[in-house]
């Protein structure tokens, strides 16, 4: 799986398409795509890929650009998009998230791709973990969580110190 925060694809569609065409990734995850309904998937990927994306909801976020997540799968990979609309994630309107179940005849796992805008309060992250923990279908399953949490100073094992830091978003 290849992952990248793209900081906008709208002006890079041709170069991105060509770049993907010359690589051989089975799964591609992108955050901060900045895409909207005016950019079609075929501008970004050849027919070798199936694409799932969630563009930022500009009305809900009161933003005019930014955000957005996208997962692209080689066409021979079986997957199913999981609808999170009727879960606790629906209250986290600032976050862009996709959940996909990837499977073959004998194995499956879930991929969660997400983008969290900068300067979210601690309460937001608490709500995220509460929403994640409420998903019954992931119990006992293999999961991959990838994306941009916008926690630039966070490193593994320093969460208590990080949250106690006076510079942590309020």
Features from the language model and the residues they span:
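A shared catalytic/ligand-binding motif for oxyanion handling
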Residues: 1-170
């Amino acid at each position: 799986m290849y992952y990248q925060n793209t900081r906008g694809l709208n002006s890079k569609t041709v170069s991105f398409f060509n770049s993907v065409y010359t690589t051989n990734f089975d799964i591609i995850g992108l955050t901060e795509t900045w895409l909207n309904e005016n950019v079609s998937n075929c501008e970004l990927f050849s027919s070798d890929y199936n694409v799932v994306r969630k563009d930022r909801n500009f009305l809900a976020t009161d933003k005019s650009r930014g955000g957005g997540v996208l997962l692209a799968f080689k066409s021979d990979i079986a997957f199913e998009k999981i609808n999170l609309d009727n879960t606790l994630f629906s209250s986290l309107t600032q976050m862009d998230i996709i959940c996909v179940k990837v499977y073959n005849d004998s194995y499956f796992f879930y991929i969660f791709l997400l983008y969290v805008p900068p300067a979210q309060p601690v309460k937001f992250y608490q709500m995220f973990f509460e929403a994640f923990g409420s998903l019954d279908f992931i119990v006992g399953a293999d999961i991959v969580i990838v994306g941009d949490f916008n926690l630039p100073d966070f490193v593994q094992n320093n969460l208590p110190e990080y949250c106690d830091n006076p510079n942590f978003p309020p």
